Amino acid sequence: MKKIGVLTSGGDAPGMNAAIRSVVRTGIYHGLDVVGIRRGYAGLIEGDFYLMDRGSVADIIQRGGTILLSARCEEFKTEEGRQKALKKMKEEGIEGLVVIGGDGSFRGAEKVSKELGIPAIGIPGTIDNDLACTDFTIGFDTAMNTIIDTINKIRDTATSHERTFVVETMGRRSGFLTLMAGLAGGAESILIPEIDFDLDDVSQKLKKGYERGKLHSIILVAEGVGDDFSTNRDINHSKAFVIGKQIAEKTGLETRVIILGHIQRGGSPTAMDRILASRMGSKAVELLLASESNKMVGYVNNKLVTCDISEALSKEKQVEKDVYKLANILSM
């Protein structure tokens, strides 16, 4: 193997640049040419490639986002689109591919490996932390700390005005980010897709808190909670606004709603995300050099591991209900 490609796909996550840096410099260390592919699978189809060197990734380890840019690509989901990508890769001489992204990105990597015959390795980069076969994904720790920092700021004004704040976080199908940020941020209530809840119970808990002398409350809500709430993504009809309105009606408490949105994806990655990305990027290159394909690099029990991408996609990562219980106990 003489030349490999690297791309980022799907939603960006802090630490992706650190992973790109690691792939490029590890590849060069092993005598490989490393080609950067801009805009994910769209760039793969269009041949938007450029040869990277050590200088290409200088001064990026601390930067959020991705220097390779990211985009969603419907065309790659078609056989015709994938054949275009294969033609471009063969013309460029790309013999292996590193894909940094979430589950959608990994489905593409699986197609590259199994259908197109190009070895591909996946690095989990998503703030949702919703991929199986790894304890942590790149970007999760940074996003969690961003939420916690925001909660701290919200508490200041919430206390001053004796208000309840409903704060919506990302997590359409997964509550990992919301749960862990809620536990670390001391949220009074945490609502996630995986665990049923009753707003009457939530409201009673809030009222009891105020009766004990609490001056404010923070309710953290994952964007994918309950079918009983509006699914219209217009900000004025967000589930968080529906929940906030119902809580205000049930409790009589002055309630405000905040949608954190894309702020959770930005910012300089934490040390943990930089280290995780650096280790995973290097491991991905080593796997390609060992003639591995259709594998994902994971991190389990403080060690790097590998698993089949198909296994990571087929398994559903479960939130720890003991952690959810602990968060409820500590918030009482």
From Swiss-Prot:
One of its GO terms (cellular component) is 6-phosphofructokinase complex. SUPFAM superfamilies: Phosphofructokinase. ATP binds at G11, R72, C73, G102, D103, G104, S105. Its cofactor is Mg(2+). Mg(2+) binds at D103. It is an enzyme of class 2 (transferase). HAMAP family: Phosphofructokinase_I_B1. This is ATP-dependent 6-phosphofructokinase. It comes from Halothermothrix orenii (strain H 168 / OCM 544 / DSM 9562). The gene is pfkA.
